[in-house]
């Protein structure tokens, strides 16, 4: 257990019946890059039951934040969803992950493609001033089935632009594009279809993705990752083959290989 820190739950927010987020204390020894994940868990039958979770908070915050689905029969999530303020949670001491901007080649525009709780690592990254220094536009696309699954929408549209540190950069550079597949909404459709048809680019006022200018990061379900990779490959982008070797786009490999 020496590779784990015990943290305390500071707050829990239930977005709807299937999604929740929670904040915990952060051991000062934990250092991570925005976009990385840690293993978190609870003690079950005397042993730690751990799962990989992206850190949704930026690395300069004193707390940690996580974003999760509720799975009624999931070994860990069935328990995590009942967390309350003051409860203890185990967090691994070794963050890792492939969604780090240092593994992207230089470019003008950064596309963050997410579905569901795949938004989590990008919540960390859109609060990173360095991301805005590196790119002229940062496009955050969040695909969900129902409107009430658009977690953090108000935070992204109202709170972030008011940041005293990088609010001006957010106003100038961040394009937030939520899209819904099973209800009426001002943006509708799967993000891969919106990219293929060109509607996404018309809506945001940028040219279609090309390998000279555009970089991307993807986090979502295995099928969404496969399809998004196919679309980006079709635009001529090349994936980063492994950690430490830059490419035009990145996927979170850990969640794929499970």
Curated annotation (Swiss-Prot):
Binding site for NADP(+): 17, 144-145, 181-182, 190
Native source species: Azotobacter vinelandii
Subunit description: Monomer.
Cofactor(s) listed in the protein's UniProt record: FAD
SUPFAM superfamilies in UniProt: Ferredoxin reductase-like, C-terminal NADP-linked domain (SSF52343), Riboflavin synthase domain-like (SSF63380)
Free-text function comment from the UniProt entry: Transports electrons between ferredoxin and NADPH.
Induction remark: Overexpressed under N(2)-fixing conditions.
Reaction(s) the record says it catalyses: 2 reduced [2Fe-2S]-[ferredoxin] + NADP(+) + H(+) = 2 oxidized [2Fe-2S]-[ferredoxin] + NADPH
Gene name of the record: fpr
The protein, known as: Ferredoxin--NADP reductase
Domain of life, source organism: Bacteria
């Amino acid at each position: 257990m020496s590779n784990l820190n015990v943290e305390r739950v500071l707050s829990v927010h239930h977005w709807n019946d299937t999604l929740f987020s929670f904040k915990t204390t952060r051991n000062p020894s934990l250092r991570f890059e925005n976009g990385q994940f840690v293993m978190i868990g609870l003690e079950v039958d005397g042993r730690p039951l751990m799962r990989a979770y992206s850190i949704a908070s930026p690395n300069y915050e004193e707390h940690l934040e996580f974003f999760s689905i509720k799975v009624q029969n999931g070994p860990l999530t069935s328990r995590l969803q009942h967390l309350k303020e003051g409860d203890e949670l185990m967090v691994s001491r070794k963050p890792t992950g492939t969604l780090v901007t240092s593994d992207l080649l230089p470019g003008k525009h950064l596309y963050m493609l997410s579905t569901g709780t795949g938004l989590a690592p990008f919540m960390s990254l859109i609060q990173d001033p360095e991301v805005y220094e590196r790119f002229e536009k940062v496009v955050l696309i969040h695909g969900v089935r129902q409107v009430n699954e658009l977690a953090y929408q108000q935070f992204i549209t109202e709170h972030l632009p008011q940041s005293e540190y990088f609010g001006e950069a957010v106003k100038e550079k961040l394009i937030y594009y939520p899209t819904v597949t099973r209800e009426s909404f001002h943006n509708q459709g799967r993000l891969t279809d919106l990219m293929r048809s060109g509607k996404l680019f018309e809506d945001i006022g940028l040219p279609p993705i090309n390998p000279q200018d555009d970089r991307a990061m993807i986090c979502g379900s295995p099928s969404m990752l496969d399809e998004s990779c196919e679309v980006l490959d079709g635009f001529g982008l090349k994936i980063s083959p492994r950690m430490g070797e830059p490419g035009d786009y990145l996927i979170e490999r850990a969640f794929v290989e499970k």
